[in-house]
Structure formats: C-alpha cells, structure tokens
Amino acid sequence: MVKVGVLKMGASGTALLVEYLLNERADRGDITVRVVTSGAKMQPEEAEVAEKLKAFDPDLVIVVSPNAALPGPKAAREAFEGKPVIVISDAPAKKAKDEFKEKGFGYILVNADSMIGARREFLDPTEMALFNADVVKVLAATGAFRLVQEAIDGVIDALKEGKTPELPQVIVTAERAVAAGNFKNPYARAKAMAAYYIAEKVADIDVKGCFIEQDPQKYIPLVASAHEMMRVAAIEADRAREIEKGSDSVYRTPHSKDGKILKKFSLMENHSKQ
C-alpha cells in the first residue's frame, strides 16, 4: 500500500481533481490518499498545513499550486525534503525548474492551467467557478490530465516495487497533452491542440489585466476577454471529444483494482492492460 499525500495551496484547475485522477472509481486497493489544503491563500505562513500531512507519513508527496516559484509553495515542498515530492503547477513555475532539479523534486508544469482574471470588478464566486469549470474541461478533454495521471502512477508503481522512483520532469505542452489524448481523428486532434493553445494564451492576457494595466477601463475588458477565451477553449476541447465519440474512438484509461492502467478505444470492447 502506497501512501500518497497531497498538499494544495491556492486554486488551479489541476488542484481541483488531482487526487481523483488517481482513483476515479474509489476502488484501488494499492494506494491510500490524504489531502490537506491552505484554501485560496498561498503566503509562506500557510505552509504550516504541511505539518498535518507529515502526521500521515506519506510515501509520496504531491504539492499543487499556481506559480510554485512563490515563497509559500516553496516552503510547503521544502517541508518534505528527503521524501519523493512532485510539484504540480503552471507555466510561471518554470522559473523555479532548475531549483526543483537541484533539490531532487519532480515537477509537472501544465501550461494551459492559466491564472484567473482576479480583478474585483469582474471576478465573483460564480465567475470563478465557471472559469475553473472551463479549465477542467480543457485539461481533461485534450489529454493533459491523463499525462498528469500517468506521470504520478509511474512513481506509485516504482514505490510499490520497492524501487527508488524516477520523479517526472514534465512540461505539459499542447503537443504532449494531445499525444496523451491519443486522438484517432486528425480534426479532433487539431481542435484539441487549438483548445490547449488558446487556454495557454489566457495567462498572458490575465497577467496584463491583473498586474500591468492600472486603469479599470483597460483592465476590466482584458480579464473579461481572457475568460471568454477560456470558454472558447473549453468548447473546442468538447468538440474534439465529440468527434471521437462519433467514430467510437474515445481513448479510455481506467485503473484496475490493483492500480494497473487499462486501455480501450471502442465503447463496448473489453479493456486491455497497458
């Protein structure tokens, strides 16, 4: 039994579902999971939630946050130095990539898990929820979540075998996400890539709207347009999956009870092991 600890700081699309990607039917017998979170806050003092996770004594620690280069997420992961740690974050965390390597941390950086348009004049709880729903659809339908899932499962498999795991060093680009999506139809693949690229660009617009522009007449339309872009990305990602449904070629990779990844394309066919 591998004990997986998940520490979440702040909000990101991947953080919403990461533990469920490992046990979608709640019937795996090879892992047990505990999750602690600091909620929306990411200040260094919030990293004290790591102490609660230490009591679980995890075999593998996953630290999920936006911009893992910030002091708060840094303090959280360093609390587990000496254990296998995987950092899951977004494109701005690339600034800390060399540090991750030096400290022996694995990383999965999801380019399309873009920051939200956090201007008070625009962002309310409803808008926040809708944006994250769109992000989740993009990451799920393009294949990005599968890439995250398989990278973590590889580490779990090594730990089950008593081996020292090789921690992932993955930047989830559009090409890598869509490869994991394993699309059969080239138009579905193209739509998935378009969705991912649009979602990536959302971060650039929101950075400008949240941190650069100071005039409300300029920054409000910017963050609103970024959210419209993510909505369009989610629509295109959904269309990609619908094309695959039409040809009965949706790629599925459920877990067996012993944690093995199964695979299938046709809806009615039996699974085979990867």
Label for each model-derived stretch:
Residues 1-58, 64-274:
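Anaerobic metallocofactor- and corrinoid-dependent redox/one-carbon enzyme cores
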